[in-house]
Design a protein with these regions (language model features):
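Active-site glycine-rich loops that stabilize anionic/oxyanionic intermediates
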Residues: 1-5, 80-81, 214-215
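Conserved alpha/beta-hydrolase
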Residues: 9-40
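Alpha/beta-hydrolase active-site loop
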Residues: 45-67
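Alpha/beta-hydrolase fold nucleophile elbow
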Residues: 69-80
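Glycine-rich nucleophile elbow surrounding the catalytic serine of serine-hydrolase chemistry
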Residues: 78-88
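Alpha/beta-hydrolase-fold enzymes
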Residues: 86-173
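Acidic catalytic loop of the alpha/beta-hydrolase fold
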Residues: 175, 214-222
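Short beta-strand/loop motif that positions the catalytic acidic residue
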Residues: 210-212
Length: 223
């Protein structure tokens, strides 16, 4: 799942898949949904190597699922931030899934990633990595809604369905402020998955399906 949401937000999709013969499992990433610290002010992966801990959690879920369904193929699907986590997973745990679906992913130049991470790092040292920074959040997400002006809400970019947008806004487990540390870790993850030496560590025999929305700003409108 993406930033500021959680696994059960996709329950209708899971129900559709189970009706068609699939078993569906999902976790709430660190700091999100039921994995968040009670009364936490921000979404926070933790003080050190949080991105990789999230990926390790994904592998732990895979292992538990395979124990219950040992003879069933395991497909890993990641959306938005989850797409970058899935790409990281495929590098760190090659050959442990039968196929992957990468949805709503993107690419940023090394210079942009380095610049953003430097800004987030400086802000974290000044305010604390578990704090929220409007400036850092604006650098990450500020441009997304501009393509949908005039805006009805601050998150019109999330979905072409107004009902989906309104449900997101009304959900108490969605829309929380992301910490500086989360953005710092996520940019580190994006840098990791973009490095050719890391890409070379993937199992090239694993089938991968890429899905991109033609109005999704994360993937530059489907580009």
């Amino acid at each position: 799942h993406g930033v500021s949401e959680y696994g059960m937000r996709y329950a209708p999709f899971a129900e559709f898949m189970t009706e068609h013969g699939f078993a569906v499992v999902a976790n709430d990433h660190l700091g999100h949904g039921l994995s968040a610290e009670k009364d936490a002010d921000t979404l926070y992966f933790g003080p050190r190597d949080g991105w990789m801990h999230v990926v390790d959690d994904m592998y732990a879920l895979r292992c538990r699922t395979k124990e219950k369904y040992p003879d069933v193929p395991y497909f890993l699907m990641g959306h938005s931030m989850g797409s970058f986590l899935t790409r990281t997973y495929l590098i760190r745990y090659p050959g442990t899934v039968d196929a992957a679906i990468i949805m709503g992913t993107g690419h940023q130049s090394p210079a942009v990633v380095a610049g953003g991470r430097a800004i987030a790092g400086a802000a974290g040292k000044r305010h604390g990595f578990d704090a929220h920074s409007p400036r850092v959040e604006n650098l990450a997400f500020g441009a997304y809604n501009k393509a949908f002006a005039p805006n009805r809400t601050e998150v019109d970019w999330l979905s072409v369905s107004e009902n989906n947008v309104d449900a997101y806004i009304a959900d108490p487990l969605c829309g929380q402020k992301a910490s500086i540390g989360l953005f710092y870790e996520m940019l580190g993850g994006i840098r990791f998955v973009s490095a050719q030496k890391n890409i070379n560590s993937m199992n090239l025999n694993t089938p991968i399906l890429f899905i991109a929305g033609d109005k999704d700003p994360v993937g530059e409108m489907g580009k």
